[in-house]
Amino acid sequence: MKVMPIVVAGAKFLQDYSKSRALDYGAGTGRNSIYLANLGIDVMAVDQDIEELEKLAINNKMIHPVKADLRDWEIQGKFDLVVATNVLQFFDNDTATRCLNDMTNCLNSGGVLCLTYILDKKFFLPVGFEEILTSKFKMINSETKVIQDPGHPDFPEPHQHKIFYFLGIKK
């Protein structure tokens, strides 16, 4: 899978890749981690299943896999970039809002947040998100798009997703 365009856009706001740290929150297969590490960014890639991430880390010393259940994981350290693509919608509203707040708090001032959130019949943007995003970030981009998904292991048939995209700089 290819890197998400919002991650490419977000990385451009970093001043010096070689001195930057990124948190890939819910890294999955590592598609965003690989892109960031190849830029020279030090990446903490966190997911509950890190088998694929560990394989990537063998060949790329900039990727540091961490096995964790994000619903109760305490973020350690500060970051210049936080990436959370299509992960928070799987949590209940209170947990998703707390996780977004934790991600905000681990960002350095001027740090970049790249967030995507699937919206559909099951998933709605949690009430607390708007308050956090508008009060803590200078918005670079915020939009909702419908995308075509060719299918994946959980749902192999082609289908669409409505996705909320947010790119912001921490105030």
Regions found by a protein language model. Name each.
Residues 86-87:
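Short catalytic micro-motifs in class I SAM-dependent methyltransferases
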Residues 97-109:
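A short glycine-rich, Lys/Arg-flanked "PGG" loop and its adjoining helix->strand segment in the class I
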Residues 83:
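A conserved beta-strand element that flanks and buttresses the S-adenosyl-L-methionine
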Residues 1-23, 28-74, 91, 95-98, ...:
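Class I (Rossmann-like) S-adenosyl-L-methionine-dependent methyltransferase catalytic domain
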